[in-house]
Amino acid sequence: MKDENELRQDLVDAYLTVDKRGLMNQASGNVSCRFRDGMLISPSGADAENISADRVVYVDGEGNYSGDIKPSSEWRMHLSIYKKQESANAV
């Protein structure tokens, strides 16, 4: 199993791949992956120019996060998917 830092970088790589393929409209796309009892998710206002592993936000299973960087405004939808679909490991 990958550690948190590897998952954070994988998330950034996925974000950049989705952006490069033209599947995001400016800062309107987000990616996440299941981690611990919650998820890692792209930050609010992310774009290809400012996303980095240290800006990825951990949101626990109750929707809590810490720090100055806010998770994507879509975090509730992502967390709901993980709660309802155990086989989902990334959104």
Kindly label every feature range from the protein language model:
Residues K2-E86:
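An anion-binding catalytic pocket shared by soluble metabolic enzymes
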Residues A90-V91:
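Short glycine-aspartate micro-motif
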